[in-house]
UniProtKB/Swiss-Prot annotation:
Residues 142-216, 228-248, 291-312, 335-354, 399-522 are annotated as: Disordered. The lineage of its organism: Eukaryota, Metazoa, Chordata, Craniata, Vertebrata. Residues 343-354 have a biased composition (Acidic residues). Residues 190-206, 485-495 have a biased composition (Basic and acidic residues). This is Uncharacterized protein C19orf44. Residues 437-451 have a biased composition (Low complexity). InterPro entries: C19orf44-like, DUF4614.
């Protein structure tokens, strides 16, 4: 009854559940996804037609579903006997893939509604026949492997009875009473044919009896799918190859390589449908994942340009394309598709199509996918040739470096030139190498121009450069006007010119050495004296005696200027000579200056004390006295003028007249 109520819900409520999925609770999200898959299987729109056939367990049931709401083409669902638990886990992984595709198609519903209605009419003619042939081989193989009895409870489908009284013409879903069966996708054994169908198609959802045990099944599925996929890949002979990020960008940027991935798979699926149907279920699931990844990663503009396929092109949303382009640099080719499938199954479906589809990996199943390896080999050969050139150039420069003193700098410049050449050949060096190549190119041009000058000018240039820039390095300002990068041809010509002018450089070296010797002699002849040397000590030196505190003659006076046996000794005594010669005007002047300084200091101290005392007095005494009313009246009474009488007024008038 609960399933019947879910089946009666309208289509918009079913797709509304996708937006209501919570990102925090992964367990409730998986249960809800299983319920959505049941609703997608059991809801019958008004435009759907179902063929009901009552057959035995070994017979196949073909369900042709046309969903105009989603804009998908005919849908195929085969009812087969219960299989082993490993097949059920593989089908669960495929069901998760179908749910991811359903989310993508739901996002693109409003934009591509008009295109998908016209494309679904064209796809009705050729698809059912091919799917019928695919189902014939896959059902027989799966029926032969029915050995596990416990899988019957896991794969049992709930019988559904669709009762719609309002519309009697609406078909009903099949009600299986004979034995429990499960819906297995016909597209699982034929993962290659998914490239022919529209990208909007989704696989029919599978239904299970116990959705609460999905976590346990997923944990077991992670181990079983990885082991089975590794064995199948070993038998099929797939080889793994780690490709760099640069090669993957080249691979996805070329449109012809895009066709090389899609067209051979179409031819294989159309020419040999029975052979693809006998592939194991795990391998088919892997190919289904690869086809989904290829449709998600490759630009859809190339698919829409092919008019013969009649498949509608789906332009991926902006966020999805941006995430794919940002993460393409980190995608590497892996040899185990089962690992990518297990990682995709383990993720919650509600995280969005961009994050879940980015976990898929790409396997190169055609020889065209290995095309970038040829260009890689050519790049490696070019790098080896450039390395050989560097080694030979280094040997030549070492031979030239031993001939003179200027050669080490030239060898360093040439080694920088070889580094710049390697950087231009590879094309992906850092900015430091570009700077070195620019500076080395300017140095090489300077050397080549100096060597190509006439013999009379070349020695002079070398002399100036060696004399001035002996202790200096090449200035970076000289390379500002030079180009930052040079082509291979220009560098080759420069190296050839340097090798030709090596003889002229060798002849210039002796002249350079002679010029250095001349300049060195000229520098040694120049005598530079210090200012202290030009200022001699005074003739009379006096020493202050600590005891007498007076000036006394020093030993320099008697030893340098006085005769050992002066005549004055016989006439004048030593005390008189000392008194006469002890007079020093400098000492008197210094004494006077010190007295003046002392007097100034005393005056300053007195002035500061006076200021301090006046400040204290001003603070102690009241500078303003507040008068009372009585004092004001007394002051007015005392200073009031006498009243003017008549007599006094007449006297004043008479005086004025």
């Amino acid at each position: 009854m609960a399933s019947a109520r879910k089946a009666s819900r309208p289509m918009r409520d079913v797709f509304g559940d996708f937006s209501d999925v919570s990102l925090e609770d992964s367990t409730m999200e998986e249960i809800r996804n299983f319920q959505i898959s049941r609703n997608l299987t059991k809801i019958a729109p008004g435009h759907s037609r179902f063929l009901k056939r009552n057959q035995t367990l070994d017979e196949k049931h073909l369900l042709l579903k046309e969903n105009p709401v989603l804009g998908s083409g005919p849908r195929l669902a085969s009812c087969r006997p219960p299989t082993t638990a490993s097949r059920i886990r593989a089908n669960a992984a495929l069901m998760k893939l179908a749910q991811l595709e359903t989310r993508i198609m739901n996002r693109k519903l409003q934009r591509n509604l008009s295109d998908t209605e016209s494309d679904s009419m064209t796809a009705d003619a050729g698809l059912p026949k091919r799917a019928d042939r695919i189902l014939s081989g896959g059902a027989l193989e799966l029926a032969s492997q029915n050995t596990d009895k416990t899988s019957q409870n896991q794969a049992r489908e709930l019988p559904v009875t669709e009762n719609n009284a309002q519309n009697a013409k609406v078909s009903r879903f099949l009600k299986k009473k004979q034995a429990p069966v499960e819906n297995i996708s016909p597209e699982a054994p034929a993962g290659k044919e998914r490239t022919l169908q529209t990208p909007k198609q989704k696989e029919p959802a599978r239904t299970f009896d116990s959705p609460d045990s999905d976590e346990e099944e997923m944990k077991v599925l992670l181990g079983s799918l990885m082991d089975s996929s590794r064995e199948k890949n070993t038998n099929q002979g797939f080889s793994s190859a780690n490709v760099s990020e640069e090669e993957e960008r080249k691979l996805f940027s070329v449109p012809s390589q895009l066709r090389a991935f899609t067209v051979p798979s179409v031819e294989l699926s159309s020419a040999k449908p029975s052979q693809t149907s006998h592939l194991p279920t795990s391998l088919a699931a892997d190919r289904t994942l690869h086809s989904t990844r290829s449709r998600a990663d490759y630009p859809q503009s190339h698919v829409s340009s092919d008019t013969a396929s009649h498949t509608p092109s789906v332009s991926i949303t902006g966020a999805f394309s941006n995430s794919v382009s940002l993460k393409m640099g980190h995608v590497k080719l892996v040899s185990s598709p089962g690992r990518s499938e297990a990682e995709t199954v383990d993720e919650p479906v509600s995280e969005g199509a961009d994050d879940s589809l980015d976990e898929f990996r790409i396997n190169i199943l055609s020889l065209d996918g290995l095309a970038p390896a040829v260009s890689e080999n050519s790049d490696l050969e070019q790098e080896e040739e450039s390395a050989q050139r560097q080694k030979t150039a280094g040997k030549i420069f070492r031979a030239e470096a031993s001939t003179g003193q200027d050669a080490p700098r030239q060898a360093q410049a040439r080694s920088w030139a070889s580094q710049g050449k390697a950087a231009s050949a590879e094309g992906d060096e850092s900015e430091v190498s570009e700077h070195l190549s620019a500076s080395s190119a300017s140095a090489i041009q300077q050397d080549s121009t100096s060597s190509m000058q006439p013999p009379s000018e070349a020695p002079m240039v070398n002399t100036v450069s060696s004399a001035y820039s002996e202790d200096f390095e090449n200035s970076p300002s000289l390379t500002a006007s030079e180009p930052t990068a040079h082509s291979k041809e220009s560098l080759d010509r420069t190296l050839d010119a340097l090798s030709e002018s090596s003889s002229s450089v060798k002849t210039d070296l002796p002249q350079t050495a002679e010029s250095r010797k001349k300049s060195g002699r000229h520098v040694t002849r120049v005598l530079v004296k210090d200012t202290a040397v030009q200022t001699p000590d005074p003739a009379f030196t006096y020493e202050w005696t600590k005891v007498a505190s007076m000036a006394a003659m020093g030993p320099a006076l008697g030893g340098a200027y006085v005769d050992p046996t002066p005549i004055a000794n016989h006439v004048i005594s030593a005390d008189a000579i000392e008194a006469l010669t002890a007079y020093s005007p400098a000492v008197l002047a210094l004494h006077d200056v010190l007295k003046q300084q002392l007097s100034l200091t005393q005056q300053f101290i007195q002035a500061s004390r006076h200021l301090h005392a006046s400040l204290l007095r001003s603070l102690d005494a009241d500078s303003f006295h507040y008068h009372t009313l009585e004092e004001a009246k007394e002051y007015i009474r005392c200073h009031r003028p006498a009243p003017l009488t008549m007599e006094d007024a007449l006297e004043e008038v008479n005086k004025e007249l």
